[in-house]
Amino acid sequence: QELLLGIGGVRAIKRYVEVSGTPAPEVFHTNEGHAGFLGLERIGDLIGQGLNFDEALQVVRAGTLFTTHTPVPAGIDRFELGMIERYFSTDLLPGVEVDDVASLGAEDYDGGDPAVFNMAVMGLRLAQRANGVSQLHGEVSRGMFGALWSGFDTADVPITSVTNGVHAPTWTDPLMVGLVKERLGHYETSAADWNAPAITDGDLWSTRRAMRDQLVRDARARVKAAWAEENPGVLVPEWMDGLLDPDVLTIGFARRVPTYKRLTLMLHDEARLRALLTDPDRPVQLVIAGKSHPADDAGKALIQRLVQFASAPELRQRIVFLPNYDIAMARLLYPGTDIWLNNPLRPLEACGTSGMKAALNGSLNLSILDGWWNEYYDGENGWAIPTADAAGDEAERDKLEANAMYDLIEHQIAPRFYDRDEQGIPRRWVQSIRHTLSTLSPELSADRMVREYVERLYVPAAHAERVITQQEAYPAKHLAAWKKQVQKEWPNVAVAHVESGGVESPQLGDELEVRAYVQLAGLSPDDVLVEVVFGRARNG
């Protein structure tokens, strides 16, 4: 599959360029290691044009971006080296040697496994630019892949970040679009002035209520349909007509169900959750949707536990699990919830986009500070569940974070939602809705994400690719030869002597004169840059 995606994908693009007359792409963007073999196909083409492997590698690197989407090593594809031998010892890529391929994915660093081929490592070595998909994920990725840049401080590992975004026209409810069109005269919800007097608190609140009502009606229909399918010929129970309430604080949770997402964290204290759901004055209702991988038995067990809890007669109208989670369901679920819940184990959420889709519709987030929420939470657009990652064990961490979540719902979220004026409008809540729509809508859209990729990564990559291929790729040939020379001589390069002076007891702001005598072996002074790190020495 990965050969088909990477090599076949580039061949398909080349064929399309051929038949359509479209200019050939200058920049290639590899999303995760799965498509990493695209770089090898491009190297093969360049070898066919007269470059050697190392020279072709410089050209490919210049015009390639690699994006990692996983924050854990277990999420990376790794194969036995024998598979590389099997596929690349053929004529699949003429001129590309097996050893050269193997070297790109080799875990030849501290902590690596020399017996495997790592697709992400290959992707990083084939790309001059790399990024994670949120600021926190970029930080995690610099730590996870830091061994590839031996001697670098983690902060200096060359992996940046571009936070994901979502397609606003797809995920913004037509009722919100209609409100903007009616009051402001345009359809651009992400660029709307949500503080404009033309959009009143009553407008916002009635629209939010209508979207909640849509969700309730859809959930009832789905639950009834599922019942009828499982119980043919049996009347649908009357209680399903009262499933959920369009006037009750609604919390949504929907996504895949790997264990790190902690679907059942909300069940940590069942008695406390039951009290929140059945509170006579400030009730809460939960709408949960998701699906587990067919082979994920742990995920299936989480769903079964949740369904069992929700089947209790006193709870079944306040908590519902919607099976067969799909886009049609999601497009009503995100806008219809007042609160979007996300409680992964930090920092295992690379970015997450479900909360973004909810926020585009004025829903507020209740989330662990992970993924995108870590950088966008500002205290007014929702609530942050404190992270207990310093807890002694997983059970203690779950307990602390679950209790914090219950506290936020009971003491902050529900009181704000149900605090109504004489017109029945929760003014403070609507203020948070306005703030969320004003500040997050432009930032969470795919428009912002694409603009950031273009300006920060694609344009520089295209420029680098043009420069390195000038004069029949002379810069690539020169760079490859220079790297080879540096690698050959580097073991003999050493700092022979360092002198410092000018200040006996240096203080912050003082100037310190440093002179270093460096043994350059076969390199010239133009080949190196000498840097000074100043600080307290660490023994050992």
Residue ranges of predicted features:
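Catalytic cores of carbohydrate-active enzymes across secretory and cytosolic contexts
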Residues: 1-540
